[in-house]
Every structure is written in C-alpha cells, then in structure tokens.
Amino acid sequence: MRVAVAVCFVLLACASPSYTADQEPAVTVLVAYHSLSGNTEKMAREVATGAKAVLGTRVVLKRVGEVTGPDLFSSDALIVGSPVYWSNMAGEVKTFFDNWQLKFGVFPEFKMRNKVGAAFTTGGQVSSGKELTMLTILAAMLGNQMIVVSGGGAFGASATTEGDSPGVDEKEAASARELGKRVAEVAGVVKRGSVK
C-alpha cells in the first residue's frame, strides 16, 4: 500500500506544472539585439530591467547571432534592438529575421504567431532613421503574425547617441525600461488571459 501511495505521489509530481495553484506560469521575454559601440546593448539591458520588474517574468538577453530556435519558440515575447545603419536595421538584425525561416523554420505554421513583439533603436543623430528602423523591425514581426506593442515612445524606445547627446541618457534608459515593462505586462495578459 505504501508503495502504491508513493508511486501516486511521484506520478502527480511529474504530471503537474512547475507552479503551484496560487502561482501563474512565468512569462518569458527574449530581448535580442545587435551592438558594436555598446549603446544598443545598454538599451537592451534597460529593456530587460523593465521586463524583470513585472512579477513572474523571466528574461533572456542575447545578441541576435546567439539566439537559437528554442530561445525563440519558448518565449512569450520578443523585443528586438538595433542600431540605425543607413536609416534601417543593422544587417545582423535583418539576418536574424531571415533566419527565422532559413534556420528555424517558422513557416508554414507561423510559429511566432500571437507572441508579443516590440522594437528599440539607437542612432547617432536626431533624425537618423530611428522611427523607420523600429518600423522595419515591427513589420518583420507583423509579417509573422505577432502582436506588436509600443511603450516608451510611439513605436518603441530609442536613444540619440552622438553629438550633444553622447551615449544613452537617463530619459532614454527610462523609456527602454518602460518598453520592457509594457511588453511583459501585455505578454502576461496574452498568456494568462488577464491583468495581474
């Protein structure tokens, strides 16, 4: 009898989810970025900090070239950051999106469908193409049937990093944190069906 009870407990433990009845499943936010100067990486870290501020959020922070298929498909949300190169996303970020099909096989099932997506950028000048860059990132997400959100700004978060505004200032960092927080909140609503 004791053996039968022990076996039942083991089976129940293996079959139950990794959270208790009063806990919600964690939301996983993947923050993927490309950075040469360190400015976009700083924004990525701020985005991650904002997402972590939402209770029950797990954050994975990686350069776009390090992201694996399991990273992508196990996430509930994806926030992509790029420096502005010629008023567009960096080639490494474009390759990341191209690899969704070439390496990870997202089609024809639309494996990113209904995941939450957002964008952030850094650019040297005030009108260097930051909004356009965010829109190209968001367009790639929309093409994959993701749910895109903003936060911190109309299209995401951005920083001007040259001239009279070198690096990422506190206002820009706060905008990045707000983006991360909003994405984590929306991902929680999508995953759980309600606001916590």
Give each language-model segment a name.
Residues 45-57, 142-143:
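Short helix-loop-beta junction
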Residues 24, 28, 68, 149-196:
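Glycine-rich phosphate/pyrophosphate-binding loop and the adjoining helix
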Residues 27-51:
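N-terminal beta1-alpha1 ligand-phosphate binding loop
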